[in-house]
Curated annotation (Swiss-Prot):
Gene3D superfamilies: 1.20.80.10, Phosphatidylinositol 3-kinase Catalytic Subunit, Chain A, domain 1 (3.10.20.90), Pleckstrin-homology domain (PH domain)/Phosphotyrosine-binding domain (PTB) (2.30.29.30), Zinc/RING finger domain, C3HC4 (zinc finger) (3.30.40.10)
Protein name in the entry: E3 ubiquitin-protein ligase MYLIP-A
The FERM domain, residue ranges: 1-279
Alphabetically ordered keywords of this record: Cytoplasm, Developmental protein, Gastrulation, Metal-binding, Transferase, Ubl conjugation pathway, Zinc, Zinc-finger
Organism annotation: Danio rerio
Length: 472
């Protein structure tokens, strides 16, 4: 089966997959061609029969989800946006930048005049290079929604000239840093109508759900902790939300089709799991539906039969797990400088699997690298699982689990491992040699993982809420 996959920069890739292939088979081939290991940030989109934008479920067959397979037309898109400093590969960062440019052009990201001026200069430097009055073009009108006056134009030109000499990679990184500070960065938009048939834009993002009018002016904001349950029925999605008075209210959103409603339900559940949870629970991973044939087979043959089974969600890792997985994968592939520094652009045709292949030829080097990797894993295992900076030196009582430092433990009301209530925190001394943590394991080893994102602290109430979101 032939798949035409359009990248965010409008380049079309031809991907050949088996007729019974799942969505992840196609995505993995695309990312392999691009040299991208951070696959979990991306997804494949297609257009439904009514023009709705739908995510291909990567765990289900492509042929069961799309209407037209001659050829299969898909779009490579960023599904989960993270902070720029958490992106380990230059290729990944470039695709993030191209996707953000498209969102800016569509008006999905709003900003003030000063931000629009700075971003206009950065986009011009990335696209046209150093300032040239004959070639420079600016996006100010698209970014700010108004025509610039001469003073504004002069300010943009001055900012553009100040960027002279900066590489494309450095400028793209700065642009992503600016965009990541905007209100709707990483928000996925769904068009729906409320109970009064008023057209709304429903934005599902890392912090919660934004309900906006047609012009993206905010009507209401719902954070994940106050969502009791999210359900889908036909073309409708229902959100049961706790108000400040502790009463519950049910919000109704009517979408254009059943698949569009399923897309909104998926977005709420998967986005919550990716950004707000420590790991993806089985309640999400194993939720599925069956067609009629599969339902009959499960009744008369075996309840666990895979015939006709379609998974509801395709998320496999949370943001923390993606970062850790990608870092280890890059290190195991022999890449030393995973965090490409701004100003040093990685060639687009460089494959991670071929990085430093000459440096790992001899058996002694391989053995040394394995020992370094084991030592690095030991060091990381002794770090707090929440902040990943301090050593583990606290035990939760009465359960006895030891997974974090005293500073993080003092902020938790329940154990993150067993969810039992914490009565008090006991300071402990792990039976390890302190000098081990200070060993230098060579230049080729990555630094201990220091996450730039704030760890989410789940209380007992928060945990029960997150479980309810996954009900269908």
């Amino acid at each position: 089966m032939l798949c035409h996959v359009t990248r965010p920069d409008a380049v079309v890739m031809e991907i050949e997959v088996d007729a019974k292939a799942n969505g992840e088979d196609c995505l993995n081939k695309v990312c392999r061609k691009l040299g991208i290991i951070e696959v979990d940030y991306f997804g494949l989109q297609f257009s439904g029969s009514k023009g709705e934008n739908l995510w291909l479920n990567l765990r289900n067959r492509i042929s069961q989800q799309m209407d037209n397979l001659t050829p299969c037309r898909l779009r490579l898109r960023v599904k989960f946006f993270v902070e720029p400093h958490l992106i380990l590969q230059e290729q990944t960062r470039h695709l993030f930048f191209m996707h953000v440019k498209e969102d800016l052009h569509r008006g999905h990201l709003r900003m003030c005049s000063e931000q629009a001026q700075e971003l206009s200069a950065l986009l011009a430097q990335a696209e046209f290079g150093d300032y040239n009055q004959n070639t420079a073009k600016y996006w100010y009108t698209e970014l700010c929604g108004s025509e610039p006056n001469q003073t504004t134009i002069n300010s943009i030109i001055a900012k553009h000239k100040a960027l002279e000499g900066l590489s494309q990679a450095s400028v793209e990184y700065q642009a992503l840093q600016l965009v990541s500070s905007l209100e709707h960065y990483g928000v996925e938009w769904h068009w729906a109508r409320d109970a009064e048939a008023q057209r709304l834009a429903i934005g599902v993002g890392p912090e919660g759900i934004a309900i906006c009018r047609d012009d993206f002016s905010l009507v209401n904001r719902i954070s994940y902790p106050i969502i009791q349950i999210a359900t889908q029925s036909g073309k409708s999605v229902y959100l049961t939300v706790t108000k400040e008075s502790s009463d519950s209210v049910v919000l109704l959103f009517k979408l254009i089709s059943n698949r569009a409603a399923s897309g909104l339900y998926r977005a709420i559940t998967e986005t919550h799991a990716f950004y707000r949870c420590d790991t993806v629970t089985n309640a999400v991973m194993m939720q599925y539906s069956r067609d009629f044939k599969g339902h009959l087979a499960s009744l008369f043959l075996n309840e666990n039969i895979n015939l006709g089974k379609k998974y509801v969600f395709d998320i496999r890792r949370t943001s923390k797990e993606v970062y850790d997985y990608a870092r280890r994968a890059l290190y195991n592939a022999g890449i030393v400088d995973m965090m490409s520094r701004p100003g040093e652009r990685t060639p687009s045709n460089r494959s991670p699997s071929r990085e430093q292949e000459g440096a790992l030829d001899c058996g002694g080097c391989q053995q040394s690298r394995l020992l370094q990797e084991k030592l690095q894993k030991l060091r990381e295992a002794l770090l707090c699982m929440l902040c990943c900076e301090e050593e583990i030196d606290a035990a939760f009582c009465p359960c006895g689990h030891m997974v974090c430092c005293q500073n993080c433990a003092a902020q938790l009301q329940s154990c993150p491992v067993c969810r039992s209530e914490v009565e008090h925190v006991q300071h402990v001394y792990l039976p390890t040699c302190t000098s081990l943590l200070n060993l230098t394991i060579g230049e080729n080893s990555p630094e201990p993982i220091h996450r730039g994102m704030a760890a989410h602290t789940c209380t007992t109430n928060d945990y029960s809420t997150s479980e309810k979101i996954y009900q269908n």
